[in-house]
Amino acid sequence: MEMTNAQRLILSNQYYLMSQMDPENSAKYQRLQTIVERGYELQMRELNKEFGCLTEAECREIIDIMEMYHAMQESNKMLADQERAEVDQRRLQFLGFDIASEAQIVHYVRFLVDSEGLYPQFDKADHHFNSQMPMLEKYRRMLTTWRNCPRQYHLCATELSQIFSA
């Protein structure tokens, strides 16, 4: 992250103020203040983590993935009891993404659910959409299979199984 000396001074002052206003996290803010004041570029990369960016296409892809799960859950509700018994109900739960490798996406999902009020039926579970394993590639394969289904919001048990297995 490139900053002028004036920008570094302003940010340093912000961290100082935060350390005074939030005593519980004072050590964290003092550390960040030191990094900015002294210009430790390796550690300044940490500051960039907070300012990630998801493109419009990436946002739409995440919404499509969540919509696919919504469609699968609604389709499952419409199945006859006998057909529903063929579907692994646990696989209908949207797990989210891996906070370690897909953090920006996890934060976006949380934003959509918590701030935007979308998909209130999704169970946050204990991990609040942190699947604890990378999921994006799996979801992409599932999305491709789902898009090939003729009736995406009225899936049969076989189609659900095919999507899960993608």
Swiss-Prot record:
Which Pfam families does the UniProt record give? YfbU
Coiled coil (residue ranges): none
The record's section on Gene3D superfamilies has: Helix hairpin bin, yfbu gene product, domain 2
The organism's superkingdom is given as: Bacteria
Kindly give the HAMAP family that the UniProt entry links to this protein.
UPF0304
Query: What does the sequence similarity comment in the record state about its family?
Result: Belongs to the UPF0304 family.
Protein name as catalogued:
UPF0304 protein VS_1049
Native organism: Vibrio atlanticus (strain LGP32) (Vibrio splendidus (strain Mel32))
